């Protein structure tokens, strides 16, 4: 892929993340995205088929970033730095699905898909992960039912709670 396409894709992804911080994903159109990114619709369609394709690529890149992180405090701290990106992935339901696949690979011992970490790490932190998915489910439902203002109001508090749980449970 040439530099121009890479630059266009980055611009599109950045614009979608920014737009998703302003309104719900379901309310974003390709037209809105193109206007925000300062690109033509043909540029968008030369790179993606739909907004869901953009989300899928953002998700793949995000999962690549978090693979290999320790599945406790380090992991949850990384979530606080990726607010708008994570909001988009949680709102669309992609984060939970992709993270579930990652855990499945980890538990199955498919080390080709897991950079660092062991099945023992997951087993030791299974309570933390259980609570994490519960909190992410609540955030996802709040976002869908009430919009992003509720999500933003509870996200940092939820992450703090997860980090606290992680610290407590990892001592058990």
Language-model-derived ranges and their functions:
Residues 1-23:
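Basic, helix-initiating cap at the start of DNA-binding domains
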Residues 12, 27, 50-55:
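Short amphipathic alpha-helical segment with a characteristic S/N-K-E followed by hydrophobic residues
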Residues 29-30, 58-69:
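Short, basic, alpha-helical segments at the C-terminal edge of helix-turn-helix-like DNA-binding modules
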Residues 34:
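The alpha-helix within a helix-turn-helix
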Residues 38-47:
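Short hydrophobic/aromatic patch on the recognition helix
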Residues 67-96:
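Hydrophobic alpha-helical connector segments
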Residues 94-139, 159-167:
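Amphipathic alpha-helical packing segments from all-alpha helical-bundle domains
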Residues 144-172:
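C-terminal peripheral helix-coil segments that are non-catalytic and often amphipathic
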């Amino acid at each position: 892929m040439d530099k121009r396409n890479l630059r266009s894709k980055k611009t599109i992804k950045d614009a979608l993340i920014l737009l998703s911080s302003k309104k719900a994903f379901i309310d974003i159109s390709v037209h809105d995205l193109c206007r925000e990114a300062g690109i033509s619709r043909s540029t968008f369609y030369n790179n993606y088929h739909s907004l869901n394709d953009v989300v899928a690529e953002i998700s793949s890149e995000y999962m690549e970033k978090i693979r290999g992180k320790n599945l406790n405090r380090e992991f949850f701290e990384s979530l606080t730095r990726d607010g708008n990106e994570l909001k988009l992935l949680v709102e669309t339901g992609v984060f939970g699905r992709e993270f579930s696949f990652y855990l499945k690979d980890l538990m199955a011992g498919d080390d080709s898909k897991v950079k660092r970490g062991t099945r023992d790490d997951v087993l030791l932190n299974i309570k933390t992960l259980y609570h994490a998915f519960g909190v992410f489910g609540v955030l996802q439902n709040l976002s869908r039912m009430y919009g992003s203002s509720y999500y933003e109001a509870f996200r940092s508090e939820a992450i703090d709670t997860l980090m606290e749980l992680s610290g407590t449970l990892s001592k058990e």
